[in-house]
Regions:
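Alpha-helical substrate-recognition element adjacent to the catalytic core
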Residues: 2-83
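Alpha-helical hydrophobic/aromatic positions enriched in membrane-embedded helices and signal peptides
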Residues: 1-3, 98-99
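C-terminal cap/substrate-recognition subdomain and adjoining C-terminal extension
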Residues: 58-144
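Residue-level detector of intrinsically disordered, flexible termini
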Residues: 1, 40-42, 134, 141-142
């Protein structure tokens, strides 16, 4: 069976933005919810956040592990053409990598046709325990 994948944004998801003059720090409570999701669905993470710029997959894994993440970062989405939205970057990754199921966890809704797979977070709160069941349910749905 093909792998299940969480496309992960970081700002506004794992790093709540509580002040608009600076980005947030990784929140251990949000990381725990992510751990519940990846464990509950047997999923791996593909980083779709701007945090992927200038970092290797190994560096992203180490950064998340240092904050308590217990899962596996397997890749990061490609950087799209100028003006491309996140949904287009995720679609490009999916075109090259078959998956059994996927969910997008982001605080922006610019996912185009992929929005039925989106768990939208509130930027000031980040990923919440109430988001986990829906994310797991979406992950367990066949891709397509």
């Amino acid at each position: 069976m093909a792998r299940r994948v969480v496309f992960l944004d970081i700002d506004g998801v794992l790093a709540p933005i509580r002040r608009w003059d600076r980005y947030g720090d990784l929140d251990p409570a949000c990381i725990r919810v992510l751990n519940e999701i990846v464990a509950g669905a047997g999923a791996a993470v593909v980083v779709s956040s701007t945090w992927r710029h200038g970092k290797t997959v190994t560096e992203l894994q180490e950064m998340l592990e240092a904050a308590g993440f217990i899962g596996c970062v397997i890749d990061k989405t490609p950087v799209g053409a100028p003006g491309a939205d996140r949904g287009e970057e995720i679609a490009a990754w999916l075109a090259e990598h078959p998956v059994g199921g996927y969910v997008i966890i982001d605080d922006h809704a610019d996912m185009g046709e992929l929005r039925t797979r989106l768990v939208l977070t509130q930027p000031a709160r980040g990923l919440q325990p109430a988001d986990a069941p829906r994310a797991i349910e979406i992950l367990k749905r066949a891709a397509g």
